[in-house]
Design a protein with these regions (language model features):
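Active-site cores that bind ATP or allylic diphosphates and position pyrophosphate for catalysis
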Residues: 1-6, 14-25, 31, 180-187, ...
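Basic, alpha-helical terminal appendages of large translation-related enzymes
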Residues: 130-205
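Catalytic adenosine-cofactor/nucleotide-binding cores of aminoacyl-tRNA synthetases and other
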Residues: 11-148
Length: 205
């Protein structure tokens, strides 16, 4: 005859097809796997949002969640006290939100990993600093960690899903012409001249 205790209703996690996650099928991502590809704070954000709604939990959701985390971090810089309370990152960090400028999104960083074929943080930092000369690893610890996560995620998830088309005869000739053009370039040439040669090779083939 007493008042029933207040319960907390929650939904199960689903895979990318909307089906229940099964250990035997391996159709999801574990906590340990998430933490290999992104920060604990990004996982906390994912868990914090919409606890009563069934959510899809799979590897491809990680970049989107990380970018949401970075976006909330940026918004927090210009929010008042009331707005901060509505910002999930404020709760993720217990009110102590790190102050660091966002260099680029995680999705863009993944594209840079693919384009540069970088396999180490040091190499990827060199590419980043070509466009952002006033940044350093020590002053951007969150971004430094993101670089490591991006390389790991690309190699484990994106790269394994890549399917490369076998070039036909005309495409093979065009690629061979491009290789010859690049081999003819030297360190004394301006980037603009190299770009012009590459463009001309493409038009000719």
């Amino acid at each position: 005859g007493k008042t029933q205790p207040s319960g907390f209703a929650y939904e199960l996690f689903l895979d990318e097809k909307g089906e229940k996650i099964s250990k035997s099928k391996g159709n999801g991502i574990t906590i340990d796997q998430w933490l290999e590809y992104a920060s604990p704070e990004s996982l906390s954000l994912y868990m914090y949002q919409n606890p009563k709604r069934a959510k899809k939990l799979y590897k491809e959701i990680v970049p989107k969640t990380v970018d949401e985390y970075l976006d909330f971090m940026e918004k927090a810089k210009n929010q008042n006290e009331l707005q901060l309370l509505m910002n999930p990152v404020w709760h993720v960090h217990n009110g102590l939100i790190p102050q660091e400028d966002t260099i680029m999104s995680f999705s863009m960083l993944l594209n840079l990993v693919e384009a540069s074929n970088a396999d180490s943080k040091e190499l990827l930092w060199k590419f980043v600093k070509k466009y952002k000369k006033d940044i350093s690893e020590k002053e951007h610890l969150i971004f430094d960690n993101l670089i490591g996560y991006a390389i790991k995620y690309f190699n484990d998830v994106i790269k394994l899903q890549k399917k490369y088309k076998k070039p036909d005869t005309s495409e093979k000739l065009a690629l061979e012409a491009l290789v010859k053009t690049l081999n003819d370039c030297n360190d004394e040439m301006l980037p603009e001249d190299i770009q012009t040669l590459i463009y001309s090779t493409g038009k000719e083939n």
